[in-house]
Amino acid sequence: MIRQCVSHRGIPCYRLAVRRVELTEPFHHPSPRPLGRKNWSTSDEAKSKRAAMRKGGAPPPEHEDWELTVGIEIHAQLDTDAKLFSRASAALDDVPNSNIALFDIALPGSQPLFQPSTLIPAIRAAIALNCDIQRIRGQRIYELTHRLIEPYAKNGSIWLGAHDGIAKEDGEGVQIGIKQIQMEQDTAKSQELPSSTYLLDFNRVSRPLIEIITLPQIHSATTAAACVRKIQAILQSVGAVTTGMEMGGLRADVNVSVRKRSEAAGDHQYDGVAGLGQRTEIKNLSSFKAVEYAIIAERDRQIAVLKAGGTIQGETRGWTLGSTETRKLRGKEGEVDYRYMPDPDLGPVIIGDDVISDLRRNIPVLPDELLQMLVQDPKYGLSTVDAKTLIELDDGQRLEYYQDAVEILITLQPDLSADFSAGKVVGNWVLHELGGLLTKSSAHWDSQRVPAQSLAEIINLLSRKNITSSSAKSLLAMAFDGDKRSISQIVEDKNLLFQSLSRHEYIALAEEVMRQNPKMVSEIREKGQLGKMGWFVGQIKRIGDPNRVEAQKAEEILRELILK
């Protein structure tokens, strides 16, 4: 059971609901910087730096004597309808300032009211990341304040394998420790307009977040990006977060330090890891590539400073998309004491062991287990690359669609040979054929654009040789473009059912294309340029009926006639 204890003052917390707050006057503040986009450097040096970033995070030869160390702080929006300290809705897409309580905007006299349901996705995240729920006096308990004083989970870890895209120097895998996870609340959203005007939307205030802090055990920018990607996949798989980095539901800060391997260990220690160099923190990175490129830029900057005889200052820095350098935001000397203290209106929260046990029993399949299933289960039989792509695309929606299509196709084909791999075929169509249409149209994923039932029916017709490959792709394109007819109706209306050519008809078509291209026939016969057979197959499809020509049969006839 999860329960909130009564405040020691015995005073219940009430919320005075506010349906909507309208600001009659815009909020003005003199802008400290000019508006407009910062010009990117066009120098040869900057171009070469960006090219090096695109090639990956491996250090150049001149940096091999330097050790990079990275720790990551991930901030993720919890998947919950409730705010952390008020009863207002946590919905983000509603009208600005429509989901706020008096406490959200800190009106005098308003009091926080902790919402226990926000703990459920937070605990799921801790379990999935192998953390221990914090224990005090034999109970799972921690004090609440507007930022929780004590982390509710500690001492976790995740494993990154080669399939996760780690750096080559990390070998087959690396384990990264999770120092702690704590709950936080989000802040208001601001929008900057011309004339030093800012619009404020308080809907996001008090929306619950978790902050996941890794140990500084990462030594490659590539592995750091892989770590963030893996944690995002884990959080999504257990329903702990709303969306990923792609949709703004997850952000990362990185702590970066370097030290020379050939010299004595550094004087700094962070989170129990000693012998490190002075670290800097890069804030608010919103994509996996941003994590990787920002670390590379800061690594190179610190090495250049130290080589020139300078010292690294503890500071907070920023990085902008397209930039090859980080920029200073503010100084940061030592650990900051935020002087958090318990709120007298918020009593301790006790999380029962039965809740932990129940959530642990019902935790969904984690990404590594899912990857293993998609690769090793004969029903799917995907390659590791395709399986990972499906898991990561569209917050897992593409994977659900794929699995639905596989199940439907299997029910449509109880009589087909066991050699037919439904999972592999469907995977190819979902990732490449359907994925190609999405890329070409720049459309977002929508599982109903081509329902899984329709895709399975197309693949079923193709595998039974009732339609040709080109007809199958045409059917998919028509469904994708909004044709609401059933697949069977389109096949009937367009007369797409395959009617095989006779052997005599194949020979006649083959002889015709050979007669038109005697030089290429000679090159195949005399020089063994068999790759040109495919061109001849294409010509047979061009002069014949493409809906009746089987590429394999056409090539067999061509080989028979040309190589006899």
From Swiss-Prot:
Reaction(s) catalysed (UniProt annotation) = L-glutamyl-tRNA(Gln) + L-glutamine + ATP + H2O = L-glutaminyl-tRNA(Gln) + L-glutamate + ADP + phosphate + H(+)
Indicate the principal place this protein occupies in or around the cell. mitochondrion
Q: Which PROSITE patterns match?
A: GATB (PS01234)
Segments carrying the region annotation (Disordered) are 26-63
Pfam families, alphabetized: GatB_N, GatB_Yqey
Tell me, what is an example of a GO biological process annotation in this record? mitochondrial translation
Q: What are the boundaries of the transit peptide?
A: 1-88
State its Enzyme Commission number(s).
6.3.5.-
Superkingdom, natural source? Eukaryota
Q: Which InterPro entries match?
A: Asn/Gln-tRNA_amidoTrfase_suB/E, Asn/Gln-tRNA_Trfase_suB/E_cat, Asn/Gln_amidotransferase, Asn/Gln_tRNA_amidoTrase-B-like, GatB, GatB_Yqey_C_2, Gln-tRNA_amidoTrfase_suB_CS, Gln_synth/guanido_kin_cat_dom
Compartment annotation:
Mitochondrion
Q: Name one GO molecular function term.
A: ATP binding
Q: Which UniProt keywords apply?
A: ATP-binding, Ligase, Mitochondrion, Nucleotide-binding, Protein biosynthesis, Transit peptide
GO terms under cellular component:
glutamyl-tRNA(Gln) amidotransferase complex; mitochondrion
Q: Give start-end of the signal peptide.
A: none
Which family is this sequence assigned to?
Belongs to the GatB/GatE family. GatB subfamily.
Q: Which PANTHER family match?
A: GLUTAMYL-TRNA GLN AMIDOTRANSFERASE SUBUNIT B MITOCHONDRIAL AND PROKARYOTIC PET112-RELATED (PTHR11659), GLUTAMYL-TRNA(GLN) AMIDOTRANSFERASE SUBUNIT B, MITOCHONDRIAL (PTHR11659:SF0)
Query: What does the record note on quaternary structure?
Result: Subunit of the heterotrimeric GatCAB amidotransferase (AdT) complex, composed of A, B and C subunits.
What exactly does this protein do? Allows the formation of correctly charged Gln-tRNA(Gln) through the transamidation of misacylated Glu-tRNA(Gln) in the mitochondria. The reaction takes place in the presence of glutamine and ATP through an activated gamma-phospho-Glu-tRNA(Gln).
- Can you name this protein? Glutamyl-tRNA(Gln) amidotransferase subunit B, mitochondrial
Organism for this UniProt entry = Ajellomyces capsulatus (strain G186AR / H82 / ATCC MYA-2454 / RMSCC 2432) (Darling's disease fungus)
